[in-house]
Every structure is written in C-alpha cells, then in structure tokens.
Swiss-Prot record:
<keyword id="KW-0479">Metal-binding</keyword>
<feature type="binding site">
    <location>
        <position position="129"/>
    </location>
    <ligand>
        <name>Ca(2+) 2</name>
    </ligand>
</feature>
<protein>
    <recommendedName>
        <fullName>Lactonase drp35</fullName>
        <ecNumber>3.1.1.-</ecNumber>
    </recommendedName>
</protein>
<feature type="binding site">
    <location>
        <position position="111"/>
    </location>
    <ligand>
        <name>Ca(2+) 2</name>
    </ligand>
</feature>
<feature type="binding site">
    <location>
        <position position="235"/>
    </location>
    <ligand>
        <name>Ca(2+) 1</name>
    </ligand>
</feature>
<dbReference type="InterPro" id="IPR051262">
    <property type="entry name" value="SMP-30/CGR1_Lactonase"/>
</dbReference>
<dbReference type="InterPro" id="IPR013658">
    <property type="entry name" value="SGL"/>
</dbReference>
<feature type="binding site">
    <location>
        <position position="132"/>
    </location>
    <ligand>
        <name>Ca(2+) 2</name>
    </ligand>
</feature>
<dbReference type="GO" id="GO:0046872">
    <property type="term" value="F:metal ion binding"/>
</dbReference>
<dbReference type="GO" id="GO:0005737">
    <property type="term" value="C:cytoplasm"/>
</dbReference>
<comment type="similarity">
    <text>Belongs to the SMP-30/CGR1 family.</text>
</comment>
<feature type="binding site">
    <location>
        <position position="47"/>
    </location>
    <ligand>
        <name>Ca(2+) 1</name>
    </ligand>
</feature>
<feature type="binding site">
    <location>
        <position position="184"/>
    </location>
    <ligand>
        <name>Ca(2+) 1</name>
    </ligand>
</feature>
<dbReference type="Pfam" id="PF08450">
    <property type="entry name" value="SGL"/>
</dbReference>
<dbReference type="GO" id="GO:0016787">
    <property type="term" value="F:hydrolase activity"/>
</dbReference>
<dbReference type="InterPro" id="IPR011042">
    <property type="entry name" value="6-blade_b-propeller_TolB-like"/>
</dbReference>
<feature type="binding site">
    <location>
        <position position="236"/>
    </location>
    <ligand>
        <name>Ca(2+) 1</name>
    </ligand>
</feature>
Length: 324
C-alpha cells in the first residue's frame, strides 16, 4: 500500500500561483499597463471615464458619489460636485456639454439618469427614479442624440436586467433586449449598426445587430460571441476607430480586446494582479484623438488606493457623440 507521501500531489506552480489565473486567453497578445495617476490612497470604486470637448477627463466613485475632473496635461484633480443621487455608476457627455450621470440607486428599483453642467448646476431628471424600476449602470449616445442604457438588475438565476433605447426628446423608452443578468457595459459601433453589451453575472458578451431604426434587432442579429471565465465578470467597455471593443474585467485586473466580430485579439494586464492587487478594473477610455487608453481600477480588497493606468491600444479612440 502506497503511503500518503508516495501519492501524486498537486503543487502551486505556474498559473496556479496567480490570484487570478488566465487560462483560455493565455495565448493572446498581452501587455501590462503603466501607472498614470493616483486618484486616492483610499480604495474608491472608480468608474465612468469620459472626456469632454476640451479634453478634460471626468470620472466618479460609485459609493461616495464624488465627481472628479482631471486635466490630462497637468494631472490636476478637481472635485466639482458630489452626486445627489445614490451610487452613480457612469458619466456620458452630451454634445451640448452637459454631463449625463447614470445612478444605481438602491441596486433594486431606484436607479435613473440625471443631467447637469460640469459644475453640477442646472440639474434635470432624464430617467426619474420615482417613476421607473430601473437600476441604470451605463449608457451610450447615438448620433441623433438618443441613447441606449443598461439595466443592472437581477443575478445569475434571476435575469431581470436589459437594454433600452431613449429617444432624442427623452420621452420614449423602447426595450432592445431583456431578461439578462446584470446588464453592465455598453458600446455602439462606429456605424451605429452594432450594440455591444456585457452581462456581468452570467459572464457573457452580447453582440446586437440593429436595423436602421436603431431599435429593431436584425433577423438572427442578437448573438453571444464570447463567454468569459472567472470571478467576477465583464464590466464597462469602449470602442476604437477600427471597431475593436475594449472590455474591463471586474475582479480580474485586466482588459480584454475583441475585434468587430467578437473574437478576442489582445489583453491588457494591471500590475500586481497576480498577487491580488488592483483587481477592480472597471472602465477603459481613450484620450480623444489618440490611441492612448486610460483604465481605472482600485485596491479596496487589499487595503490599497485608487489608480488610473495607461497603454496604447490598437487604434485611435472613436470620436463619439460629444465630439460630433
């Protein structure tokens, strides 16, 4: 009879030494991001990166509601206002300069969207939390001034979330897809024919081909080209001018890059991820007119701070609605 010492034994080595091992994407082109700017020595749930027409970067922290404004040239950080709504999750900028802020509310039924100036003045409810049951996480404008938003509700076995389109006059809300589990990131292709959506707690990437009206799905047009692995799942996303999609992986300290057909073609790693640091990567965004990508993450779980990281992407960022 073999002793316990003689038995085949598993050892931590190679990928199994990592807190967040990469298995299925290990052969992809892989680069490691460089630190760009420390937002706080405290762990803040950073999200919502977006640049205005003057090249100023706006972002927020979800749990405390701070809205930050950063000058990329000087790296000066300002806090122009604090969200009056609970748990803001994304900022998008209208071509008229207003900030549209998505908020999650109580994470059940009191989310919405409000608009404000860059200083937090002239508040306007766009989607009111009192008259809806949404938990709004993110949005993307089309060239007509309407927008798509994600409903962040549900969980893996109770898919209550979905994606909706709001008309340019903000009066009509049309469902695009429903019954998905925590709809999160959303991006629109350069020709506005394809809508990308990440489904966080089901670890899926949706590719939705749209008719010219922007709300009707083409025959067989709603597909799932990719299933992610690991904890927690895909988060916010953006596109470049070649229609590549950049998806932040929350809880994994990395960004995955897909081509316009949904095939993975590259990945960006956050330093320290193998040791369990800076895993809460939430949002990638391009500096306008460049291929320089900014990524936000934080180290709440390990008692660390909140950082922005940077790399160069495959192509320049797409000039979206606020620049048109």
């Amino acid at each position: 009879m073999m002793s316990q010492q003689d038995l085949p034994t598993l050892f931590y080595s190679g990928k199994s030494n990592s807190a967040v091992p990469i298995i299925s994407e290990s052969e992809l082109q892989t680069i490691t991001a460089e630190p760009w700017l420390e937002i706080s020595k405290k762990g803040l749930q950073l999200e919502g990166l977006n640049f205005d027409r003057q090249g100023q970067l706006f972002l927020l922290d979800v749990f405390e509601g701070n809205i930050f404004k950063i000058n990329p040239e000087t790296k000066e950080i300002k806090r122009p206002f604090v969200s009056h709504k609970a748990n803001p999750a994304a900022i998008k900028i209208h071509k008229d300069g207003r900030l549209f802020v998505c908020y999650l509310g109580d994470f059940k039924s009191t989310g919405g969207i409000f608009a404000a100036t860059e200083n937090g003045d002239n508040l306007q409810d766009i989607i009111e939390d009192l008259s809806t049951a949404y938990c709004i996480d993110d949005m993307v404008f089309d060239s007509k001034g309407g927008f798509y938003f994600t409903d962040f509700r549900g969980y893996s076995t109770n898919p209550l979330g979905g994606v909706y389109y709001v008309s340019p006059d903000f009066r009509t809300v049309t469902p695009i897809i429903q019954n998905i589990s925590v709809a999160n990131g959303i991006a629109l292709s350069t020709d506005e024919k394809v809508l990308w959506v990440t489904e966080t707690t089901a670890n899926r990437l949706h590719r939705i081909a749209l008719e010219d009206d922007g709300v009707t799905i083409q025959p067989f047009g709603a597909t799932i080209p990719y299933y992610f692995t690991g904890h927690e799942g895909p988060d916010s996303c953006c596109i470049d001018s070649d229609d590549n999609l950049y998806v932040a992986m929350y809880g994994q300290g990395r960004v995955l890059v897909f081509n316009k057909r949904g095939y993975p073609i590259g990945q960006i790693l956050i330093p320290g991820r193998d040791e369990g640091h800076m895993l809460r990567s939430t949002h990638p965004q391009f500096i306008p007119g460049t291929n320089q990508l900014i990524i936000c993450s934080n180290d709440i779980e390990m008692g660390g701070g909140s950082m922005l990281y940077t790399v160069n992407g495959f192509a320049k960022g797409h000039q979206s609605f606020q620049f048109q």
